[in-house]
Amino acid sequence: MTTLGQRDRRPDALGSLSVLPDETICVLLEYLAPRDIAHLACVSSVMYILCNEEPLWMSLCLRRAKGPLEYKGSWKKTTLHLEGVTQENDAYRKCFHFDGFMSLYLYKRFYRCNTSLDGFSFDNGNVERRRNISLDEFSKEYDAKKPVLLSGLADSWPASNTWTIDQLSEKYGEVPFRISQRSPNKISMKFKDYIAYMKTQRDEDPLYVFDDKFGEAAPELLKDYSVPHLFQEDWFEILDKESRPPYRWLIVGPERSGASWHVDPALTSAWNTLLCGRKRWALYPPGKVPLGVTVHVNEDDGDVSIDTPSSLQWWLDYYPLLADEDKPIECTLLPGETIYVPSGWWHCILNLEPTVAVTQNFVNKENFGFVCLDMAPGYHHKGVCRAGLLALDDENSEDLEEETHDEEDNTLSYSDLTRKEKRTRMNGGGETENREEDVNGVSKRYNMWKNGFSYDIDFLASFLDKERDHYNFPWSMGNSVGQREMRAWLSKLWVLKPEMRELIWKGACIALNAEKWLRCLEEVCTFHNLPLVTEDEKLPVGTGSNPVYLLSDYAIKLFVEGGLEQSMYGLGTELEFYDILGRADSPLKTHIPEVLASGILFFEKGSYKVVPWDGKRIPDIISSSSFDFDASMLNSEFPFGIWNKTLREHKNQGKPAPDSFGSLSSHVWPYIITKRCKGKIFAQLRDDLTWNDAQNLAFFLGQQLRNLHLLPYPPVTRPELLNVNAVHEELNIPAEWKVFVDALCQKKKDVTSRLENWGNPIPRALMTKIDEYIPDDFFVDLLHVFKETNGGDEIKPCTWIHSDVMDDNIHMEPYADDSVDGQHNSWRPSHILDFSDLTIGDPICDLIPIYLDVFRGDADLLKKLLENYGLPLIRSRSSENGTTKTADSTRKKVLSPSYRTMCYCILHEENVLGSIFSIWDELRTAESWEQVEQTVWSLLNTY
C-alpha cells in the first residue's frame, strides 16, 4: 500500500520475494547470521528497512548471547558489540528514509513496541478478593479449585517496603540475575545493567528478570519474605536441593513485559505476590485453550510445548475477537496482593508499569494426583489436561463435534494430527488471517470444551495409555524431575507421610503403574517362600532404572528396562560374571551382595508362573517361541552372556536396539534376589559424610576397581566379533580390543546429533570441533597400541567394566561402635551394587562415573583412589615410563590418559559431558576440547 501519488517500491526492491507477506520475510531473516543481515541490507531499500528492524536484531542477539549481557542502547549495537564490530564512527551513520513503502505488519509491531498501558487496568470482580482467610477456608473453597486474590499476606514482609526498583538496584546492582526470553540460551544480566535496559528499551516483549536461583545469587532476599501460611505445604520440599525442581522466582519487569499464555510445569499450583507496580492477569480453567494458542504434545515422549503470541499482542489482537462469554477471568493485581493459581489453569500476565514480584509453585495433597498424572508416560492425557477434549484423536473429536454443532459450523481448525506431534490450536493466526471466521467459531468450540470435560483426576486418568510402562517409555525432557528423582520422591513420601499413603499409592499407580509391579513382586515372594510384602515395602526404591524392592532381608530386582531382550542380556551377563567370580580367588566376593536366587516370571493363560534360571540355558518360555537362535548362541555356556550381549550391541550401534522378544515383553520379566545390605546407599549419605569417610570411600573404590579389573573374563568366541577390523588382522591385535575400538568408532558417527539433543550446558562452539579433536586416525592409533603383542605375560588390554559405579550403586554401613541414640556419625563402604551393565573394555572407563558422579570432580579423592588402584592405566608395552617408543606424535597423544579419557567422555552414550560442564562451570566458555581435557583429566597423566 502507498499513499496517493507515490510509487510502490516493494516489487522492484524485493523482486520475487514481494509475493511473500512481510511477516514471513521477517521470520526468514532470523535464520541468517548478523553479517549476512548487514550485507542483505545493502541489496535494496526495502531490504534495508526490514534488516534494520530492532526485533530482528533482538532475536539475533539473544540467540548468540552467552553469560552476562550488557545492553548497548539498541539491539543492533548490542549484537555488533558481541560480534566484535567496532562502532567508533557510528555518529555520522544516519538512517536512510524511503517513501513508497508501507507495512501493516511492521506498523502494528511498532505500535506494540511504543504503546503506553497507563489506562489498561481492568477488574470486573470475577476473581474473588479475600482477606484474613483461614487455612481451612482456603482448602475447602479454593485449593485446586479456583483462583482467588488475597490481601494482607505480605503486610509484615520487609519486602513490602524494600523491594522497589531503585532500592534493589542500589543493593544488588552488581548481582547477575537470570533473564526470561524466548531463545533457548540461558542469559543473565547484572541488575544495574538490566535496570538501564528496562528504562531505555522499546521492545514489544521486553526481557524481564525471572530467576529461580535468586536465593543463591542474593541470599539476603530470602529474608525479606516468607511463604504465606496458606501455601507452606510443599511435597517437593522433601527432595534434596539438587533433585528438587525450580520452585521460586524473583520477577522484575517493565511495562509491556510479562508471561504469555501457559500452564504451570507439572500441573503444580502457584502463588504470586506483587510488591510494586500493577499486573493485569487473565485466566482460563483447565482444558480451555485460549484463542491464538497452539498446544503441541509429542507422541514419542509426551513433551508439551506451546506456541503463543506475546501477552501484549494477545490483548490487543485476540482479546477483541472474543464474545463476552468466551473472555477469560480477569483482574488487575495491585501492590501487596497475592493471587493463587490452581493446578492446570491457563494464565497470562501483562505488566502495566515496572513491577517487582515473587512467586512459588508447590505440590500438596490437593494437586498431588495431577502432578503424578503429568509425569506418567504417554501423551494423550497430557493433551487432555491442557486442551480438554479437543486434544483427542480425529475420530474421537468428530464424534464429540456432532454432539455440539452442525457440520457447516466447522470454522475453527482445532485438531491437526501429524506423525510425531498432536497439535491442538484455538486459531487466530498471524497478521494476515481472516478474523471473521474466528469470531464465528470460537464460542461453539468453547461449548465443545465444556461438554463432558472435567478436571477430575479419575476422569483424566482414563486417558492414560493402558500399556504404559514407566521404565520403558521415553521420559519427557519437559518433566520437572527425572525418572529416578520421581521414584525417589514417591518412595520418600511413602516413608515420611504414612497418613497419606492411600493418596500416595493412587499417585504411584498413575505414574509408575505400581500395582502391576507389586503383583509381580508378590508372585516372586510366594514362589521362593519369602515373607509377605509389608505395607512399608510396597513401593520400589527410587534409584536404579528397574523396579527394585527392599524387603526385610532381601533385595528383589525385576528386569524390565529396554524390553525383554535387553533384560535377558542384562541378567544373563550378570549371572555369567557371578559364576566367574565364584570360581576365582578374588577379595571382590565379599563386597558384592550374595545372590540367593534368579529366575523368570511370566503371565500365561490368566495366571503368573515362575521358573528358576541361572543363566546357563535359554529358558523354555523364550526358546518355545518363534525366535531363531544361531548355533553359537545355543552352544554357549551362557547364551545371554557378555559376548552375545556385545554382539547385539555391535549390530545395533547408532540406533535404538529392537526388542526381538517384543511380543513377550509385556508379560515376561527376569528377576534376581540378593541378600539385602544393611545400611544406606551413598546417595542418601553424601552430605553427611566426614572428610575421613570420603577418603575411606576413595580407598575402598580403588581397591575394588583393582579387584574387578584383575578378574578374568571369557575369551571372544563369536565369529562375527572376531572379524571386526579384519583389515588389521596381521597386527595380532587382541580380539577384545578390536571389538572395543570398533564400538567407539561406531559411536562417533552420530556423536554430534547426540550432543545437540542433550544441549545445555554443552557449549555449542565445541560441538563443531569434535572431528578436529577426535580425527578418524584416532581409532587406528588406538588399535595400534596393542599391535605385535605375543600374549605371554603381557597385561591384557581390556578388563571387566562395571560402567555404573555411581552414588546409588555404592552401599555404606555404619561403624558398629559409632552411634549416639541410634544416629551414626561415621560410615564405611561395604558393597558395590548392580552388575547388569557390565562390558569389557579400557579400564579407564570405570573412572569416569566415579570421578564425575561420586567424587563430583574432587581431585584429592581421585588421587586417593589411584593410590590404591595400583594398576597401569595405559596397558601396553609400547608405553614405558609415560613415553612411547613410537616416533609418531599422534600415537603419543593416544597413549595420554587424559586425552583418551576425554575422548571416551565425548563418545559416551550417557551425557557425561553435561556433568563435566555442570561441575566446572567455567568450562562453558571453553574454546577447545584440549582446555576441557586439561582442566578435568590432566591429573591422570601424573599417575
From Swiss-Prot:
Residues 14-60 form the F-box domain. Residues 396-438 are annotated as: Disordered. GO terms for cellular component: nucleus. Fe cation binds at H262, D264, H347. Its main location: nucleus. Its cofactor is Fe(2+). Mostly expressed in leaves, and, to a lower extent, in inflorescences, roots, siliques and stems. The keyword Iron applies. Keywords: Iron, Metal-binding, Nucleus, Oxidoreductase. Its EC number is 1.14.11.-. InterPro entries: Aminoglycoside_PTrfase, Cupin_8, F-box-like_dom_sf, F-box_dom, JmjC_dom, JMJD6_ArgDemeth/LysHydrox, Kinase-like_dom_sf. It is an enzyme of class 1 (oxidoreductase). Belongs to the JARID1 histone demethylase family. PANTHER family: ARGININE DEMETHYLASE AND LYSYL-HYDROXYLASE JMJD, TRANSCRIPTION FACTOR JUMONJI, JMJC DOMAIN-CONTAINING PROTEIN. This is Lysine-specific demethylase JMJ21. It comes from Arabidopsis thaliana (Mouse-ear cress).
